[in-house]
Structures are given as structure tokens and as C-alpha cells.
Amino acid sequence: MKINKITLFCGGSGSESIIKYFINQKNIQLTLLINAYDDGKSTGTLRKNIPGLLGPSDFRKNFSYLINLFSDEQRNLKKVFEFRFNKKISINNFYLNIKNSKNLEKYIPKEINFLEKEIKKDILNYLLISIKYLKTTEINLIDFSLGNLIFAGIFLKEKKNFNLAVKKFTNFITTKVKIINISMPRLI
């Protein structure tokens, strides 16, 4: 069978249907070229407070399109990444609870408990890194994406290397799709 190589330019939305179509074709080798210039909602707040961070939501959304929903592990991971806080939570309060592993179910979807032990540990570690970095701010987490906070933690842990953060974030999902960041950080 001949393999067709398809490259798709995309941002955070608008390409879900076509991505899902291509990943279900056995004769397609898909590459996603993703721009990361989103600056709305939690992404905008994170970009404002973490210098050099591009839009994590553009990658998070595309990763969620690639998740194999026939796998319980991946389905639970998607729920964790896509979770949005629906009430006011101070960054400092969230930090203290994550740090002490108290009341996690009050803040994080229960699906995190069904992930492999190492994945759960990594996610909580990345969350702790991003929240610790942001805890001096007055950020309120209402409508924040948990996946964006996880990505921000990876970015900070990897010494603000966005492309390495993309690679590390991709390691959470099972995919054959090649993902390339085509964004440039601000040059000024």
C-alpha cells in the first residue's frame, strides 16, 4: 500500500474533523504544522505572565484531536487536559493544595486517578511547577484550562524551550502524527 504524506497547517481550532479523518486512514502519514499565537482566556494570561511562552492551547487542542478515544487511559488523559475550572480559585490556594496533595478531587477531575502512576506524578509535578511560578500573581483560575497549566509547567521545567515542551507534552499521547511548531516567539 502506498503511503501518502499529508501536511496540515493548523491553529487551535477549525481542523478537528479533517485531522480525525486523516488519522483514521491507514495510508496517510500526517504532519501537523501548528501556529501558537492564541492569546485568549487562560492562554493570554499565561503568555502575559510567563515570558517566551507561546499559545499552549493551540497544541493542547490539536493533541486532544489525536488522542485514541478507544483507550481508557487516553480518554482519561483527554478529560484531564480539557478540564476547565468552573469556579473562582486563587492561584495560591490551588498551589497549597497541589503541593500537599490535599483535596485534589476538589480541583482536578477524578480521571487523573485512573492514569498510570508515573503519568499522574508527571502531571502533578508540571502543575506544581507552573502554579509555583505564578503564585505571586493575582490570577484567578476560573475558566483556566488544566492542560494549559500542565503545558506551562513543562515549558518552565525545560528552561523555557517551547519546542522541547511540545515534544514532552506529545509524549503523553499515543500517536504516529508528527507535530511541528511553526511559531516564532516575539523578537522584541
Locate predicted features.
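Short, conserved loop/helix-junction motifs that constitute active-site signature segments
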Residues: 23-28
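Electropositive, gly/pro-rich neighborhoods at or near active sites that engage anionic ligands
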Residues: 37-188
